[in-house]
């Protein structure tokens, strides 16, 4: 049996996987976020450990853990966990969604002119490196004591095994990794007055990084199981649904929208805010576009139009009057990441007349989210990635919307179920691979069951193509007014 642990922002999830790859038990412990100042977002690493300990004991109360062979860890990326020479935490961890260090991002790019080539990414406040520069500039007494910097999930690893280690996919989100070489960049570290000595050892996602310490194994009533590298949340989530090899891609419809495509080599397009990271699978990389408001636009629109729920919104969209004329919706309610990298981008309805009501607005929102998702997919494909299959995760029972997305993108989308387990499943699967031979990986990381293939309708593709062009022109014209 195998365990996967996912340290999320809102909770710690632990799952138990059997030899057939089936989830037999699961438990989640909630976490809270501290926001002591505007833009700040922090958590106490000790709370991570206490929640993990509680989740593991609850898992053991549901099913015996005495036959567990391996344990994998996934988690929220980019967080800065600062330790002193005694490996004690110096301050609350600064999280991925903390926005205090925009100025430090520019300073780092000025210091290292090749930073985008080295890291494959634009410097953004969410990443780890600018957080350390902020600490150096604003909390000098804390920075002077920093001996080690760990990512959130790797702090759990330290408590479990006593080892200082990370995996390639999570390390790629620090902006200290030379992503093409899969190694720390001395130049990027030096820009933060750090060196390799402050960094954990690097491993692939299915590499063994240590064993559970005897006292931890005893507390959890399990053997001293192997602990593997694991992965950052997006990479581990992709592994969980079988995205392990070049030519595979997934479109995830959550609060935000993420398009994740696997490659066999390092590719990048930082000028379009495409993320380029190492994958959690050996010898693989991935590109990722991020739309900040996807399903959250549907929640917002349901309230705006007075419809009872998102399903009601989607049902209303299907009754929209075709003769009323088109309405465009810019879905930038939280700014936008890919491809615009514009935190000032705003949501807009354009084209309203007396003929438009709630149903037409509902359809416009679904289409607008689709146009923005397709924009992100297009810039990823412009990096010379040609996915053989795109798995669609999320979207609930909204067959109408899923087909609309296929028609807007002009690409087949394979809707698969079972992806709701999340990154914990990928972490457990990586542990499963570690215990077996690497050659067995394809059989152990099979795709989830296919429920429906959404093939684009040529007539609807032709309808949406000019609508997408107008969508892009509306944003271009309004962009100067959004700052």
UniProtKB/Swiss-Prot annotation:
Site (Important for activity): 6
Any one Pfam family match given in the protein's UniProt record, by short name: FGGY_C
EC number from the UniProt entry: 2.7.1.17
UniProt catalytic activity: D-xylulose + ATP = D-xylulose 5-phosphate + ADP + H(+)
Keyword Cytoplasm included in the entry's annotation: no
Active site: 233 (proton acceptor)
UniProt enzyme class: transferase
Keyword terms of this UniProt record: ATP-binding, Carbohydrate metabolism, Kinase, Nucleotide-binding, Transferase, Xylose metabolism
GO biological process: D-xylose metabolic process; xylulose catabolic process
Family label: Belongs to the FGGY kinase family.
NCBIfam families: PRK15027.1, XylB
Functional summary from the UniProt entry: Catalyzes the phosphorylation of D-xylulose to D-xylulose 5-phosphate.
PANTHER family per UniProt: SUGAR KINASE (PTHR43095), XYLULOSE KINASE (PTHR43095:SF6)
Protein name as annotated: Xylulose kinase
Name of the gene: xylB
